[in-house]
Amino acid sequence: MAFIQEIKRKMTTVQSTIKITNAMKMVSRAKFVRFKKQFKEVNYFFNEFYKAVGQVVLSLKKMPKPLENPKTLWVMMSSSLGLCGQHNTNMNKLLQTKFQPGDKIFFLGRKNQSFWNKGDTDNPTVGYVDIQDRDLSFDYCQQVSDQIMEQFDLHQLDRICIIYTQFKNPLIQHANSFQVFPFDVAMFKAFNPVKMEQKLDFEPDEETIIKLISPQFFDIALYGGLVETKLCESASRQNAMDAAAKNAKDLYEKYSIQFNKLRQNSITQEIIEIIGGIS
């Protein structure tokens, strides 16, 4: 009888879990719809802006040479909340393959800090901003980019790279990275695969334009990466909660079958005892 009560208690607990995971799934779904709309609105502009900047970069008379053993400031766009599947883990794994001694990390979101902050003297963290969903705007990203550039200059680093999550579809998202400063010629060639037939004239010259647009490019790249990463985070959390709800339902059915069998055996035993007493 005590075991039956224990199974019943577990069933009640699982029912509560199902309600919680379903509620979190609905919240994640609402955020996903909002961020997807925001992503669609800005993605076209970002792509066209990258192409326009690429035309200037690829028109340089003297292409910048790749840096040898550069010291990098990695901007990690992790989440501030958990229960989002492999979203944060995948970015950590990607950075592990790229991180070199002397590199530094600026965190946007708090979840991945503990993985990299080992408490020793070689702590790579140089900054942290906890960006909430309601803070995600271009103006706010401009303020954050100023903080990042301060750390970049303070630690005398060579380049800035962003670690973010690239959106494929609601079920598939990939951790990715790209260099935002100095300009990566290979990235702009990917955005401008067709060779320009007519050479463009720039006023002022290309070098001056690049110096002027570099801060704006960083602001836009930061905002675009955050919007896409937030979209991926909400999709990943929605999938995680959906899987958790399904697993909880399966567990509830298992407990329900077990409960019914035990209850049936208990009733059968009581009937046998009653019949035995009458006879």
Curated annotation (Swiss-Prot):
InterPro entries named among the record's database cross-references: ATP_synth_F1_ATPase_gsu, ATP_synth_F1_gsu
Entry-linked SUPFAM superfamilies: ATP synthase (F1-ATPase), gamma subunit
Membrane protein topology class: Peripheral membrane protein
Compartments where found: Cell membrane
Disulfide-bond pairs as recorded: none
Gene3D superfamilies tied to this protein: 3.40.1380.10, ATP synthase, gamma subunit, helix hairpin domain
One annotated GO biological process: proton motive force-driven plasma membrane ATP synthesis
Primary location group: membrane
Alphabetized UniProt keyword annotations: ATP synthesis, Cell membrane, CF(1), Hydrogen ion transport, Ion transport, Membrane, Transport
Quaternary structure note: F-type ATPases have 2 components, CF(1) - the catalytic core - and CF(0) - the membrane proton channel. CF(1) has five subunits: alpha(3), beta(3), gamma(1), delta(1), epsilon(1). CF(0) has three main subunits: a, b and c.
Similarity comment: Belongs to the ATPase gamma chain family.
PANTHER family named among the record's database cross-references: ATP SYNTHASE GAMMA CHAIN (PTHR11693), ATP SYNTHASE SUBUNIT GAMMA, MITOCHONDRIAL (PTHR11693:SF22)
Described purpose of this protein according to its UniProt entry: Produces ATP from ADP in the presence of a proton gradient across the membrane. The gamma chain is believed to be important in regulating ATPase activity and the flow of protons through the CF(0) complex.
Name the record gives this protein: ATP synthase gamma chain
Naturally occurring in which organism (per UniProt): Mycoplasma pneumoniae (strain ATCC 29342 / M129 / Subtype 1) (Mycoplasmoides pneumoniae)
Lineage: Bacteria, Bacillati, Mycoplasmatota, Mycoplasmoidales, Mycoplasmoidaceae
